[in-house]
Amino acid sequence: MFLRRLGGWLPRPWGRKKSTKTDLPAPEPRWVDSSPENSGSDWDSAPETMGDVGPLKTKDSGTRRPPQAAPESSRDTRVYQLGSKRMDSLKKDKAASAIQESARLETGGAVPKLDLDPVDSGGMKNLGVSPQGRLGTTGPEALLEKPGRRQKLLRWLRGEPGAPSHYLQDPEEYLQISTNLTLHLLELLASALLALCSRPLRAILDALGLRGPVGLWLHGLLCFLAALHGLHAVLSLLTAHPLHFACLFGLLQALVLAVSLREPVEDEETADWESEGQGKEAKEQTEGPGRAL
């Protein structure tokens, strides 16, 4: 074995063929013809591979291949990877700035803050991740979660719990708004008809000489009949054009609901102001004797 290694280290140009392709990075192992006819020795007849021979030699000179080629290639790959990671981080920073700008324009100047962690081992930044390892509350998803004016209006119209409305606090009271409105409209119509026909009927009865209890009874009966015929005429007119009067009633009901739903909020605000004023007065009264002492 030692002689075989020694024979491999010694230069023997007549024993094996020299490799002509020395620029290849990793030559494939091949069998060398080391027969007794070529080498002239019996111990050299065993087959051996190029891996046992040692470093390759160039054709022109006996110098070895410089070992700096592999480190240079690995260094180039590392530089390329670092450059690609920096480009990715720059792209993510630009995306984050674009998101902040769009959010600032939508919210009217309020810029949401994105959680930016320090640079990790790969040289990249994590956007929207808190140090505890959980997703931050800020970001495009959080921006989408914030309700806009249209969503608030829809919630207010639907009477949802998240809407700024007091509809769900006392539903029975607010359900009586529409019924009371219809009742008041019919009452106004009947009172207008009665006021319209009361004086003429009273004048007619006085002219006929019907006074006293009999005149009062007749006056009441005639007013009832006149109001009944008047209501029949008005209701027939309303049923002849239901769409137009329904639109008018809807507009009137919307105004009444807007006013009645806004009043409790104002009442609560005034109550809060009054309670705050009373609290300040009580503090001043308690602090007054203390200062005097």
UniProtKB/Swiss-Prot annotation:
Leader sequence residues: none
**Superkingdom, natural source:** Eukaryota
Q: Where is the composition biased (Basic and acidic residues)?
A: 85-95, 277-286
Phosphoserine PTM positions read 34-35, 89
One Pfam family linked to the record: DUF4661
Q: Where is this region: Disordered?
A: 1-95, 268-293
Q: Which UniProt keywords apply?
A: Phosphoprotein
Q: Does the keyword Nucleus apply?
A: no
Q: Which InterPro entries match?
A: DUF4661
This chain belongs to the protein called Uncharacterized protein C6orf47 homolog
Gene source species: Rattus norvegicus (Rat)
